[in-house]
Amino acid sequence: MERIKELRNLMSQSRTREILTKTTVDHMAIIKKYTSGRQEKNPSLRMKWMMAMKYPITADKRITEMIPERNEQGQTLWSKMSDAGSDRVMVSPLAVTWWNRNGPMTSTVHYPKIYKTYFEKVERLKHGTFGPVHFRNQVKIRRRVDINPGHADLSAKEAQDVIMEVVFPNEVGARILTSESQLTITKEKKEELQDCKISPLMVAYMLERELVRKTRFLPVAGGTSSVYIEVLHLTQGTCWEQMYTPGGEVRNDDVDQSLIIAARNIVRRAAVSADPLASLLEMCHSTQIGGTRMVDILRQNPTEEQAVDICKAAMGLRISSSFSFGGFTFKRTSGSSVKREEEVLTGNLQTLKIRVHEGYEEFTMVGKRATAILRKTTRRLIQLIVSGRDEQSIAEAIIVAMVFSQEDCMIKAVRGDLNFVNRANQRLNPMHQLLRHFQKDAKVLFQNWGIEHIDNVMGMIGVLPDMTPSTEMSMRGVRVSKMGVDEYSSAERVVVSIDRFLRVRDQRGNVLLSPEEVSETQGTEKLTITYSSSMMWEINGPESVLVNTYQWIIRNWETVKIQWSQNPTMLYNKMEFEPFQSLVPKAIRGQYSGFVRTLFQQMRDVLGTFDTTQIIKLLPFAAAPPKQSRMQFSSLTVNVRGSGMRILVRGNSPVFNYNKTTKRLTILGKDAGTLTEDPDEGTSGVESAVLRGFLILGKEDRRYGPALSINELSNLAKGEKANVLIGQGDVVLVMKRKRDSSILTDSQTATKRIRMAIN
């Protein structure tokens, strides 16, 4: 009340009213700025001003029972005055010091677990090495980077469910933990955080850091993996850079790196198979990276790379709307075009059919080592502004832009024929033909492009056909800039479609990606990549193909054996035998196949010549299209270890060695597994024992369906008849007995009956 009276009193004085009503707006704005709202306008000043007071801090009343009134030096720690407007006490900064030194201790066991990301960061910095500082112009471009090392790749929603389940397990609310990673993390964290005294909110914040990828759009020159981004402020300024080697790696960077390598290998391999899309999906579904299924990683990981995006498109996931050409990511920033087929003549008078983009368009081009802005219209480059790390990188960007422009002088610069093919030996499309041609040698292209005088523009410089910089002249429309071009910042994802040749299109039908765009760069993955698909056996070389092929036969011997006798053609066409063909000398593949198939047919016809080891050994050779010839072979050659090695048709060799006593098969000295049945047991024990409870009726009868293996017999109902495959690859018809009492006699009669049925 007193205060209000005082204010009324002030307002009654004419001078006060005059000041408040007539003060100019700029002063008024300042007054407003510092007096309106709860937001502190000058925090540092406020802090200094507050800390100059004796008791700037308020604390809960209970503190007076836990802290002495004075410290050892006799300084007062808290005031007897209570804080105006709350029931807290006023405390001196010295009280905080006293508390830190003498306050109660608590268990620290949970700290490294909760603040895991911080502790790990300290370790990385401790073991990292900082090199010299270099002063030079930094070409930085903004890229979307991962700023949070050491995280899992859960979506925000998935992480939220995990955090709620770990931190507030008893709260109400629907939480569905479905993915493998969610369940594993939840279990792990619940165990780690038993009896944890750290505030739940803090735990939730820290868990979020650990579970979710956080990205920012930051100016970067150099490494973009998260262990470099966390020290960005230490390694690059506007005009300097400091060399740095991280003191440790984090799984999220390793996952990104290994995912790219796996995707590239898979796309390259799928492109050369008969049905690329089906093969790609089969491989993605059967591959694991660091023990996690590749398809799960693809669903969660936002890495944008050509091969990764092709795999995502195949799985029906959304991808970025930018497109790829010549290893650069193009994003249209303005303009539009329509496409029209046009026939053009190269300098060698070869006709090319190209899809011409008609209309004015502007693009940003972002590559690994160079970036550019491109303005073009129908078959004409208007302007190209490039920046890059070095001459080579700048030249690469210029070539791609010139080809993309579809200018006539570029097409006329072609010397010789264009006949580039992809890995599957199919001709590349015309635009990629042109690109490959000029990537090999761009001399004529640059020479024929034409040059022009240039104006002196800050930060821009000309470039001559031999790639030397110049301030007077430049190739027509081309300039080199000191500034980089930012990557496209939006993280929007669009629905795309993919055809069986792995060409990815947006909904308007524009091609965004194709296997030609997948980099040929080879790298060594940081995490173990396990390809279970037979298509990837060859990635580790011929020996791996050999071992894997035989391992596959042994693992699937039960079904292989049935197919061998019933439906050999289907067996020979199995894709698992495809990789093996590359080991067999091309000239003789057909003869080998014909020879082995004839041998197998004799085995089927002549009783008692079924030889498991020999069938396993020779089967892969029968997969090639056979040539009929009278040739006989005592050994077959395979190309491994850089030379031809022999597999003996009868008997063991260093390549294929079967040990009868241990039943183990070794291929090139490597263990390839154990055969579950002994090839040389004849009919004596196994069949008669297994055929107890069955009556052998006679020869195979096709009306009762395909032959079952002995293991499958147990599924028959009493009285049911079936064909069954017995040891030597012979098929007989049996019936399951209706009564169990007569089972004992079966063993004795089985052997006789089998012989009779077969003969």
From Swiss-Prot:
It is found in: Virion; Host nucleus; Host mitochondrion. Disulfide bonds: none annotated. It comes from the Viruses. Transmembrane segments: none annotated. InterPro entries: Flu_PB2_2nd, Flu_PB2_6th, Flu_PB2_C, Flu_PB2_CAP-bd, Flu_PB2_middle, Flu_PB2_N, INV_PB2, PB2_helical. GO terms for cellular component: host cell mitochondrion; host cell nucleus; virion component. A motif (Nuclear localization signal) lies at residues 736-739. Its main location: virion. Gene3D superfamilies: Polymerase Basic Protein 2, C-terminal domain (3.30.30.90). GO terms for molecular function: RNA binding; RNA-directed RNA polymerase activity. Keywords: Cap snatching, Eukaryotic host gene expression shutoff by virus, Eukaryotic host transcription shutoff by virus, Host gene expression shutoff by virus, Host mitochondrion, Host nucleus, Host-virus interaction, Inhibition of host innate immune response by virus, Inhibition of host MAVS by virus, Inhibition of host RLR pathway by virus, Inhibition of host RNA polymerase II by virus, mRNA capping, mRNA processing, Viral immunoevasion, Viral transcription, Virion. GO terms for biological process: 7-methylguanosine mRNA capping; cap snatching; DNA-templated transcription; symbiont-mediated suppression of host cytoplasmic pattern recognition receptor signaling pathway via inhibition of MAVS activity; symbiont-mediated suppression of host gene expression; symbiont-mediated suppression of host mRNA transcription via inhibition of RNA polymerase II activity; viral RNA genome replication. The record marks 627 as: Mammalian adaptation. It holds the Pfam family Flu_PB2_1st. Belongs to the influenza viruses PB2 family. Plays an essential role in transcription initiation and cap-stealing mechanism, in which cellular capped pre-mRNAs are used to generate primers for viral transcription. Recognizes and binds the 7-methylguanosine-containing cap of the target pre-RNA which is subsequently cleaved after 10-13 nucleotides by the viral protein PA. Plays a role in the initiation of the viral genome replication and modulates the activity of the ribonucleoprotein (RNP) complex. Influenza RNA polymerase is composed of three subunits: PB1, PB2 and PA. Interacts (via N-terminus) with PB1 (via C-terminus). Interacts with nucleoprotein NP (via N-terminus). Interacts (via N-terminus) with host MAVS (via N-terminus); this interaction inhibits host innate immune response. HAMAP family: INV_PB2. This is Polymerase basic protein 2. The gene is PB2.
